[in-house]
Amino acid sequence: MAKKVQAYVKLQVAAGMANPSPPVGPALGQQGVNIMEFCKAFNAKTESVEKGLPIPVVITVYSDRSFTFVTKTPPAAVLLKKAAGIKSGSGKPNKDKVGKVTSAQVREIAETKAADMTGSDVDAMARSIAGTARSMGLVVED
């Protein structure tokens, strides 16, 4: 018989740096999950990813307090900031431009995020990423 799902916990955790401190500890402790077990499993799964990159994770907690988790790709905004070499986006994206990204970089990010995005093809996903870039105050160059 299938296990009964108790809760879904969605978090963003830095790759390879999961530890019992907030936000991981309180979110999982509330559900009665073994926090260190999750931290070890998450860090092992994300050791190939650049350390410190925020990774969205969805943890499925079952009624017997066991769990499974699925990692996603880093948020588009984080990948765009890394590609443009900036710390943060613009407070006034329509007026103040803070950096530039090439359409090749945008396409590369779209290919990276393809597994998590709902787009019919890479071009559609690239347009979506370009829209995110514009809303951050980045200029997309050809």
From Swiss-Prot:
GO CC annotation terms, alphabetical: cytosolic large ribosomal subunit
GO biological process: translation
Keywords carried by this UniProt record: Methylation, Ribonucleoprotein, Ribosomal protein, RNA-binding, rRNA-binding
MF-aspect GO terms: large ribosomal subunit rRNA binding; structural constituent of ribosome
Modification after translation: One or more lysine residues are methylated.
CDD domains hit by this protein: Ribosomal_L11
Function: Forms part of the ribosomal stalk which helps the ribosome interact with GTP-bound translation factors.
Quaternary structure note: Part of the ribosomal stalk of the 50S ribosomal subunit. Interacts with L10 and the large rRNA to form the base of the stalk. L10 forms an elongated spine to which L12 dimers bind in a sequential fashion forming a multimeric L10(L12)X complex.
Family: Belongs to the universal ribosomal protein uL11 family.
Descriptive protein name: Large ribosomal subunit protein uL11
